[in-house]
A protein has these predicted regions:
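N-terminal leader/linker segments that initiate helical-solenoid repeat arrays
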Residues: 25-71, 86-87
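Amphipathic alpha-helical scaffolding segments comprising HEAT/armadillo-like alpha-solenoid repeats
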Residues: 36-49, 70-82, 101-113, 132-144, ...
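Short inter-helical turns and helix N-cap capping residues of alpha-solenoid HEAT/ARM repeat scaffolds
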Residues: 53-54, 84-85, 115-116, 146-147, ...
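Solenoidal tandem-repeat scaffolds enriched in leucines and small polar residues
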Residues: 147-225, 240-245
Length: 381
């Protein structure tokens, strides 16, 4: 088992674990043995959660096991892939990809026959990412599926394998059908990560359906370029706060100082999510402006805002991130604590250990589950 070479880190982990778990060292127990006990303790938490009668907890166990990136949890993920609840199966499939591409490829072939349309679509999509020449025939068999989601997934998967002949299935999906169907086509097109397809998404920004514009902005994401700047600046003035905050996040992906003044102006927007998104975008642009917003948002009266703030802090390197996440870990709301726990895992580093270890005895099983998965991840780094 891999551990840090720094003796102070080992001692920190041991002391904190003993403090929170109530365990005691054996008379001649070595630090490595204690580390192994922490690993075993965390694995048991995940195993227990996967046996829960609560489907939400089982799903958390599958997702947390994937976040651990630990090969020793592949058997647990394979078991989760056969769960009766479709979200648990979906998280198991997504999680195993983070650990073993070969296992993920094998599992995606099997789950391409799943009864749930979302799981089936995700498995087909994964075959496009991980498959080889033999995967094409499996994917093509789903092009005539009665489920639009599956057809979209198949067309996208073939595109990733170099076959662009079915791209019209996705492009046609942008034009008609129900709004939900259009959102799906937009999402799959965005996940192809091909800049030559971005103009199709950009064209949707000129429409009059707020939801279509919102999902198009999300799909464009990091593929945004300077040519989009005028549209983004215009959308940042939109009456719909969802469009203001999503256009701000997209603007944050542009390189350089473009749009800084517009982002700074949104730091005083009437909507909390817009203010938060502007602050996130400014951090991504290496600007120190509006950093105080994170300290305000982590204490907002709306638990949804507190949760979103905690989640975003996992991706951002700001000076007081650890202190803000500590506040979120002690929040009375389970959703906020869950987001904070996962964010601490994303933050990583020696200082993440005591924060995560403290959550192994949280009052809610879902928080303990995510803490266990992320502790395992940190121990393997």
């Amino acid at each position: 088992m891999l551990v840090s070479k720094k003796s102070d880190l080992l001692l920190l982990i041991i002391v904190v674990f003993l403090f929170f778990s109530g365990n005691t060292l054996q008379a001649n127990e070595k630090p490595q043995e204690t580390m192994d006990r922490i690993l075993e303790f965390s694995i048991k938490i995940l195993e227990k959660s996967l046996q829960s009668e609560n489907a939400f907890i089982r799903s958390a166990a599958a997702r947390a096991a994937g976040e651990s990136e630990y090969s020793g949890l592949i058997p647990l993920l394979k078991k989760a892939a056969k769960d009766s609840y479709h979200t648990t199966r979906l998280f198991a499939l997504q999680g195993i990809k983070k650990i073993s591409l070969n296992e993920a490829r094998t599992l995606s072939i099997d789950m391409s026959k799943d009864l749930n349309v979302w799981v089936r679509g995700a498995a087909i999509e994964m075959l496009g990412e991980l498959g080889d020449g033999t995967s094409g025939s499996i994917i093509q068999s789903h092009l005539k599926s009665p489920d639009r989601t599956v057809r979209y997934a198949a067309a996208g998967a073939l595109f990733k394998l170099g076959d662009e002949s079915q791209l019209d299935i996705l492009l046609d999906g942008l034009k008609g059908g129900s709004s939900i169907d259009r959102y799906q086509a937009i999402g799959y097109l965005g996940k192809l990560n091909d800049k030559k397809l971005t103009p199709y998404l950009e064209d949707l920004l000129s429409g009059n359906e707020d939801e279509v514009i919102f999902y198009s902005l999300k799909a464009i994401g990091k593929k945004a370029d300077q040519d989009m700047l005028p549209r983004l600046l215009n959308l940042m003035k939109h009456v719909n706060p969802s469009l203001r905050y999503q256009s701000a996040l997209t603007l944050g992906e542009l390189k350089g100082d473009s749009g800084l003044d517009a982002l700074r102006s949104l730091c005083s927007d009437e909507n909390a999510m817009v203010r938060l998104s502007a602050a996130v975008a400014l951090v991504r642009k290496k600007s120190d402006y509006c950093h105080e917003i994170f300290s305000v948002m982590i204490k907002d009266a709306d638990y949804g805002i507190r949760s979103s703030t905690a989640r975003m802090l996992g991706e951002l390197e700001i000076q007081n991130r650890e202190q803000l996440l500590l506040m979120a870990l002690m929040d009375k709301n389970i959703r906020v604590r869950t987001s904070a726990t996962r964010a601490v895992g994303m933050m990583g580093g020696p200082r993440a250990f005591p924060l995560l270890l403290s959550k192994l005895e949280d009052s809610q099983e879902v928080v303990r589950t995510y803490a266990a998965g992320n502790i395992i991840k940190l121990m393997k780094q």
